[in-house]
């Protein structure tokens, strides 16, 4: 009796990752290095990798742990310019990492995930994607493993402060800082005392 080989052939695993920030890059590197017979695609809404370090541009934006602890063990950087590296330097490190290990070919930029659901019958995920700026062109991709690596602070919103809607000046959130904003010579009020406000305040005073 000849046995069918089907049960002994490894099943190709399809993986979809949402987010090409520091976690998405780490996961991608682990998968292509350690797992055989896998296809993986990372989708990111931005035009480049880096996640929060590609988006945050507020004055003084930097990591709040020593730079040498904020890097990949498989791509150490001994040349950080300061103890707490600023956002631009961290982004350069992430981009150079993606280039060095040829990871960009697995990433599709300018694509937003609008939803996902589990297909119980076929035991697979349906992931819904949309090209940025094209709300009429939603596609669905199927995968066996669906990984969300978008971070926790991506969807910012302004606080609910009485009178904010009638304020005559400009209202800016640090997570949506305008590129090239000139704040010199202006009266600036900073609301909050977390990490971003502390970094921002110190730089605004310069």
Give each language-model segment a name.
Residues 1-15, 33-38, 123, 139, ...:
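Extreme N-terminal leader/targeting segments of oxidoreductases
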Residues 72, 76-80, 86, 90, ...:
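Glycine-rich dinucleotide-binding loop and its adjacent helix/turn
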Residues 81-153:
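Feature captures the FAD/FMN-dependent oxidoreductase FAD-binding
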Residues 12, 110, 185:
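Phosphate-coordination loops involved in phosphoryl transfer and adenosine-cofactor binding
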Residues 14, 144, 186:
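Conserved acidic residues
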Residues 45-96:
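Glycine-rich active-site loop/strand segments that organize a redox cofactor
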């Amino acid at each position: 009796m000849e046995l069918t080989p089907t049960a002994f052939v490894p099943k190709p695993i399809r993986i979809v990752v949402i987010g090409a920030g520091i976690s998405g890059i780490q996961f991608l590197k682990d998968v292509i290095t350690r797992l055989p017979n896998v296809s993986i695609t990372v989708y990111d809404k931005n035009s480049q990798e880096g996640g929060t370090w590609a988006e945050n541009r507020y004055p003084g934006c930097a990591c709040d742990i020593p730079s040498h602890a904020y890097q990949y063990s498989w791509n150490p950087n001994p040349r950080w310019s300061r103890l707490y590296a600023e956002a631009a330097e961290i982004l350069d490190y992430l981009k150079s990492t993606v280039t060095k290990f040829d990871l960009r070919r697995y990433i599709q930029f300018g694509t937003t995930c609008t939803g996902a659901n589990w297909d119980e019958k076929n035991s697979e995920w349906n992931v819904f994607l949309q090209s940025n700026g094209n709300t009429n062109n939603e596609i669905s991709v199927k995968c066996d493993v669906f990984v969300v690596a978008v971070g926790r602070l991506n969807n910012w919103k302004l606080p609910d402060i009485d009178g904010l809607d009638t304020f005559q000046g400009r209202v800016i959130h640090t997570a949506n800082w305008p590129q090239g904003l000139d704040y010199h010579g202006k009266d600036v009020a900073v609301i909050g005392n977390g990490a971003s406000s502390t970094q921002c305040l110190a730089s605004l005073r310069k």
